[in-house]
């Protein structure tokens, strides 16, 4: 018998503390009256708690976040907030009021400027900026939550939860708390009496401690909807190069598209330009993707075999219900999204990730963290890296081999698709990422790089494509990036003879090298030129949010 055994160590402190707090709340069942939520939170929380708050990419537990911001800072303070997405003003009100102190997150979007300011003012401490699945993983290691605040559509009085198309992060967040003696509170839009009144059970009631009916339906952002009317000729040109110079060249059959008008253009060119090239059935068959409305024409044209989704998208519910062969749906017909599983699929099961960024340096390192803007990364670092644990082969993965060797491995295609200048004439290509200086001023141990250059296989701009996986040295890699960087300082740093040699060797291609005339990149190539066209393609099943309606 060792010394620890003789001291009578207590092995159930977390469980005992949870039971104490539940007794303090003194609720007769699992349903918290809407108007009592603030006082209940003050009984269930303690200073310094680790609190998961569902902020997702789209779905927001906004009633819980608003009520959390109303607790008494004298009672509840210095919380350690763990949030996949920081997207609402009250998320940061928590820090201004002293209710919260530390933040671990993945993405901030609209709150990126304010996070940076709060950090500068000393009101907020950053634990780390994560990719989504990294943050979920830490909930099961060193960030076990004391409390999880999540959102669903419906619940019964036993806590059974229907999360439906917007399941997103919820299962990963709930399980970490429910099975390590954390407290789980779910806000719902509607309370029903019995399980049989739920469309299906996405999370069992035994995982949920309390449910509360919100004062209004939870906020959800149509984050991945892009109006085709805003797609420019530059986007179309880049999309043509992507389809012919990357997708067809490497036989990309499974993929993820990042958010943006450039990838929306690719989706809308598949039924037109892709058809002209005879590529249907050869590329773009399997997708890990939010249900982009701009993918509807490709689905209807027979290009797409399957789509697994990170989250839902407002207006796509009935279209998805009518296409169960394509999407993952439950017996009730509604989609089941799951960001954790979709991120895993995007890491190990797809041939390619293609997405944009705000800054790229000379070696193709990229970041969305810039001076005064701490936006985070979302899923890009996970989707946009080559997982060395992968063992199954596909044509595209094998196509990245540069020499025959049975001990070599293939590689995921990671494509950075950017215009050489951002809006406001800010160069995308820079000598040094702002992230380096941000790390110094913020006391971060490492620069917040989104995608490291050694994972990037291609850089695609309106100038052309750099096939970086074929670079034979860092110096050549830098020259290849410069060759497609336009008139930025990076681009002006390479001479015409070097560019000509790179084009001659096929390591860099311009549109003309692919047989693409720039004058052919017109909006007439788009399978849909407006949101109304997407509705027509869907046979009226797509119901776009009001802000995207022009009729």
Q: Could you describe each region identified by the protein language model?
A:
Residues 1-551:
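Conserved alpha/beta enzyme-core scaffold
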């Amino acid at each position: 018998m060792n010394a620890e055994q003789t001291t009578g160590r207590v092995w159930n402190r977390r469980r005992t503390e949870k039971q104490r707090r539940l007794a303090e709340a003194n609720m007769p069942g699992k349903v918290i009256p809407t108007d009592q939520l603030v006082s209940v939170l003050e009984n269930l929380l303690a200073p310094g708690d680790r609190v998961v708050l569902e902020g997702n990419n789209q779905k927001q537990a906004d009633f819980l976040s608003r009520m959390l911001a109303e607790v008494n800072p004298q009672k509840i303070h210095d919380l350690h907030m763990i949030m996949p997405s920081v997207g609402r003003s009250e998320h940061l009100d928590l820090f201004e009021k002293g209710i919260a102190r530390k933040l671990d997150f993945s993405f901030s979007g609209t709150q990126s400027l304010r996070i940076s300011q709060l950090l500068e003012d000393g009101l907020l401490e950053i634990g780390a900026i994560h990719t989504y699945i990294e943050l979920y993983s830490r909930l099961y290691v060193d960030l076990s939550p004391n409390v999880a605040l999540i959102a669903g559509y419906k619940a019964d009085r036993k806590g059974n939860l229907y999360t439906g198309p917007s399941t997103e992060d919820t299962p990963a967040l709930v399980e970490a708390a429910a099975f390590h003696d954390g407290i789980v509170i779910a806000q719902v839009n509607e309370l029903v009496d019995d399980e049989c009144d739920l469309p299906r059970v996405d999370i069992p009631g035994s995982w949920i401690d309390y449910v509360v009916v919100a004062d209004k339906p939870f906020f959800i952002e149509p984050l991945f909807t892009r109006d085709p009317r805003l797609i420019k000729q530059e986007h179309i040109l880049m999309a043509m190069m992507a389809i012919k110079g990357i997708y067809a060249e490497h036989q990309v059959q499974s993929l993820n598209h990042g958010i943006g008008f450039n990838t929306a253009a690719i989706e809308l060119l598949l039924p037109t330009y892709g058809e002209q090239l005879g590529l249907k059935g050869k590329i773009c068959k399997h997708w890990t993707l939010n249900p982009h409305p701009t993918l509807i024409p490709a689905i209807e044209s027979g290009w797409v075999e399957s789509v697994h989704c990170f989250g839902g998208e407002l207006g796509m519910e009935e279209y998805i219900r009518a296409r169960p062969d394509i999407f993952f749906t439950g017996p009730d017909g509604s989609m089941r999204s799951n960001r954790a599983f979709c991120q895993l699929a995007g890491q190990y099961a797809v041939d390619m990730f293609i997405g944009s960024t705000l800054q790229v340096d000379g070696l193709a390192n990229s970041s969305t963290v810039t001076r005064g803007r701490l936006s985070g990364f979302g899923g890009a670092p996970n989707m946009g890296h080559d997982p060395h644990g992968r063992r199954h082969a596909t044509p595209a993965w094998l196509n990245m081999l540069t020499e025959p060797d049975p001990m070599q491995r293939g590689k995921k295609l990671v494509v950075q698709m950017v215009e050489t200048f951002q809006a406001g004439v800010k160069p995308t290509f820079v000598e040094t990422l702002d992230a380096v200086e941000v790390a110094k001023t913020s006391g971060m141990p490492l620069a917040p790089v989104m995608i490291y250059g050694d994972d990037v296989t291609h850089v695609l701009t309106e100038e052309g494509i750099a096939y970086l996986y074929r670079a034979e040295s860092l110096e050549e890699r830098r020259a290849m990036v410069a060759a497609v960087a336009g008139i930025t300082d990076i681009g002006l740093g390479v001479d015409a003879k070097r560019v000509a040699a790179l084009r001659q060797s096929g390591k860099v291609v311009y549109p003309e090298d692919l047989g693409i005339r720039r004058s052919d990149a017109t909006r007439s190539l788009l399978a849909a030129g407006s949101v109304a066209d997407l509705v027509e393609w869907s046979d009226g099943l797509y119901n776009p949010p009001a802000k995207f309606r022009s009729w």
